């Protein structure tokens, strides 16, 4: 395929792995990569603190049938230091002979820590490999693709996992996730996905490859619009006195903008504004609910053409302190701007801010 060959020219060390076309989202891709490369008796280490909520059941932090823990894979984590930097002493102490794989979540998820740059990730990978040369370093690259000049595979990552209904799909990919990196690791993922001995040699493409490649072609422009929208969001809410992560003048590492709103009511008003600006289901009123995979109610605003797409205008967050909402996406800068202005209008109507 010319498209795949072109990617390999751009990223010479990159082995394009599983590109799953069914209803496949990043948690599935991460579970696949972990399950394929961890065996009973191995240990998984997170040197960046707790994983994203939906991975807790995959790992077994919260009990769930089929988790890694159920299959004899242990887990430990090293929390970040109070300033958000890596605890290198703690990481060194945590790595031992059973530590098989290190998982690095680039984006903040539902936390208010800064997201990590490719350069920071590269330094962490080098440190981990200095402690144990054969350790596998995997990066959850969701929301970070194309935001910086470098990607995790440029700075030593053995395996990178992400979603096609986020940055790389450019808003056109209707579904899909990806795993890429070192050939032997990707082969194991392919065997896990289909069957040993079959790997990537089987599977229907369902006529979706054109959408994937066209989305990838447009992705740099779409991601740029999304980043611009995030900066605008930070500037607006920063000026109103809310804490925003990152700040409006900080360097961007991903497309997510966190805004600490301080109350359930403010989160709901914000999300109602985003939903009202949506091209699909703008008449719907988002409400918090017990979403599978989360330990608290979650509110989501996403009137998107592709269900679950977070490169399209969207906002969400768990209903818990510090009541932070996470804004991302916008296929065009103008739509992102409209969404934020609508969120401000709903906040004003609810008597939560004064302009």
Show which residues each predicted segment covers:
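Conserved N-terminal alpha-helix of the aminotransferase class I/II PLP-enzyme fold
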Residues: 1-29
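Broad structural signal for hydrophobic residues in well-ordered alpha-helices, predominantly aliphatic
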Residues: 6, 10, 33-34, 128, ...
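Short glycine-rich or small-residue beta-strand-to-loop segments that form or flank ligand, phosphate
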Residues: 17-23, 219, 255-260
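Generic structural signal for hydrophobic residues
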Residues: 2-6, 124, 233, 270
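Conserved C-terminal alpha-helix-loop-beta "cap" of PLP-dependent enzymes
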Residues: 238-355
């Amino acid at each position: 395929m010319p498209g795949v060959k072109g990617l390999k020219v751009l990223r010479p060390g990159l082995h394009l792995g599983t590109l799953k076309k069914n209803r496949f989202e990043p948690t599935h891709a991460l579970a696949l990569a972990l399950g394929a490369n961890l065996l009973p008796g191995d240990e998984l280490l997170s040197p960046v603190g707790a994983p994203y909520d939906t991975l807790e059941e995959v790992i077994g932090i919260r009990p769930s049938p089929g988790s890694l823990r159920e299959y004899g894979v242990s887990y430990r984590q090293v929390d970040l230091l109070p300033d958000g930097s890596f605890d290198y002493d703690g990481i060194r102490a945590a790595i031992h002979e059973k530590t098989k794989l290190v998982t690095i979540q680039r984006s903040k998820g539902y936390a208010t820590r800064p997201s990590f740059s490719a350069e920071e990730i590269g330094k962490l990978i080098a440190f981990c490999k200095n402690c144990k040369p054969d350790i596998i370093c995997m990066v959850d690259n969701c929301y970070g693709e194309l935001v910086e000049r470098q990607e995790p595979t440029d700075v030593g990552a053995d395996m990178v996992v992400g979603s096609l209904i986020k940055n790389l799909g450019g808003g056109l990919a209707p579904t899909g996730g990806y795993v890429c990196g070192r050939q032997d690791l990707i082969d194991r993922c392919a065997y896990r996905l289909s069957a040993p001995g079959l790997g990537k040699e089987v599977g229907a493409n369902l006529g979706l490859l054109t959408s994937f490649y066209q989305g990838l072609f447009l992705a740099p422009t779409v991601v740029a619009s999304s980043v611009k929208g995030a900066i605008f969001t930070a500037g607006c809410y920063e000026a109103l006195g809310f804490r925003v992560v990152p700040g409006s003048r900080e360097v961007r590492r991903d497309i997510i903008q966190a805004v600490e709103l301080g109350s359930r009511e403010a989160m709901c008003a914000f999300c109602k504004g985003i939903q009202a600006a949506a091209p699909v289901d703008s008449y719907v009123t988002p409400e918090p609910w017990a979403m599978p995979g989360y330990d608290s109610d979650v509110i989501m605003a996403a009137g998107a053409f592709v269900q679950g797409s977070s490169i399209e205008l969207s906002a969400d967050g768990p209903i818990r302190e510090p009541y932070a909402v996470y804004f991302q996406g916008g296929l065009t800068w103008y739509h992102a701007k409209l969404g934020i202005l609508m969120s401000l209008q709903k906040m004003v109507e609810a008597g939560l801010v004064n302009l």
